[in-house]
Curated annotation (Swiss-Prot):
It comes from Conus achatinus. This is Conotoxin Ac4.3a. Expressed by the venom duct. Keywords: Amidation, Disulfide bond, Gamma-carboxyglutamic acid, Glycoprotein, Hydroxylation, Ion channel impairing toxin, Neurotoxin, Pyrrolidone carboxylic acid, Secreted, Toxin. Transmembrane segments: none annotated. Contains 3 disulfide bonds. Probable neurotoxin with ion channel inhibitor activity. Its main location: secreted. The cysteine framework is IV (CC-C-C-C-C). Belongs to the conotoxin A superfamily. Coiled coil: none annotated. The keyword Secreted applies. It is found in: Secreted.
Length: 52
């Protein structure tokens, strides 16, 4: 069952990536930070935590 859970999580990740990629070239009419394409925004910005 662990493998199935992992597969589900992978699918969810892909869905998020696909939704994010819509504004990174596939849909020029949607503007968004370029770092959203490779998820570099999320790595720098940790919601709920302010330790800089």
């Amino acid at each position: 069952s662990d493998f199935r859970n992992a597969a589900v999580h992978e699918r969810q990740k892909e869905l998020v990536v696909t939704a994010t990629t819509t504004c990174c070239g596939y849909n020029p009419m949607t503007s968004c930070p370029r770092c959203m394409c490779d998820s570099s925004c999320n790595k720098k910005k940790k919601p709920g935590r302010r330790n800089d």
